[in-house]
Every structure is written in C-alpha cells, then in structure tokens.
C-alpha cells in the first residue's frame, strides 16, 4: 500500500469559529494550531497547507493558570543596542491589542518557515464578540467540551 499524499488542488478548507472566553491560553492555542495545520484531518500531509480557516472571538477573555497572568513575560528586541523590551501577560491583555496573546501562542506552535507563515494567515483573532466573517458560515467548535481542563473553573 502506498502512502497517501494530499495534492494542493484537492484541499477543502472549512471555516471554524472558536469562542475563547474562559479558555486556558495554551490549550486553546494547541487546538487552533492543529486545525491550522490540518492535523485533525485523515488527509494530513506535512508539506501541504490543508488546514482550516480559524476565527477566534473574545480573545481578550482568555485565562492563564497559576501565576502566569502576572509572571509570564513576553520579550522582543527593537534591533538597536540595548533594545530588549518586555511586557507581562497582564499588560498585553489589558493593553490595546489583547488578541496578540492568542496570536503569539499559536504562532509559536506552528512551524517556522514559508508553510507556517502561510498557515498563520488562515487565523483571524478578534478581541470582541463580533467578527466580519458571517458570510463564510463558520461552524462553531466548542473547545471547552473537548477536555474539562480546557476551561478554567474558578
């Protein structure tokens, strides 16, 4: 029996809607990354972009476990000498672009390279409950029901 290899022309992409309210960031990012890559499909091929389009709403209402909300630090460098910058998860979630917490978590779970960058373009993250993709008729994926640990309980 020969190994099945998906052809790019045969790829069928669905639209998936995920409500991130109350979900744990890392567990949510894992589910999103698997859907972006297409690993949930039996036709998964590592070198083909056969993942789905994922829409995430309420990204500003995600939660961290333990003390990560106050202690987790995101670093970046400006490119200038002494230009290391840092912000905590709390500062990011309370800042102008709280959706970046989810974007960065997913970005770091997707392969780094041309295919990973193309797959990340299939991710749309919104801080509020509204999204402009109603015409695509996304099907709702309840991440909290997949595993009880996905949703933080008080």
Curated annotation (Swiss-Prot):
One cellular-component annotation, GO: cytosolic large ribosomal subunit
Signal peptide coordinates: none
InterPro entries named among the record's database cross-references: Ribosomal_uL13 (IPR005822), Ribosomal_uL13_bac-type (IPR005823), Ribosomal_uL13_sf (IPR036899)
Alphabetical UniProt keywords: Ribonucleoprotein, Ribosomal protein
CDD domains the record matches: Ribosomal_L13
UniProt-recorded Gene Ontology molecular function terms: mRNA binding; structural constituent of ribosome
Gene3D superfamilies membership: Ribosomal protein L13
One Gene Ontology term from the biological process aspect of the record: negative regulation of translation
SUPFAM superfamilies in the cross-refs: Ribosomal protein L13 (SSF52161)
Function of the molecule: This protein is one of the early assembly proteins of the 50S ribosomal subunit, although it is not seen to bind rRNA by itself. It is important during the early stages of 50S assembly.
Subunit structure: Part of the 50S ribosomal subunit.
Name of the protein in its database record: Large ribosomal subunit protein uL13
Highest classification ranks of the organism: Bacteria, Pseudomonadati, Pseudomonadota, Alphaproteobacteria, Hyphomicrobiales
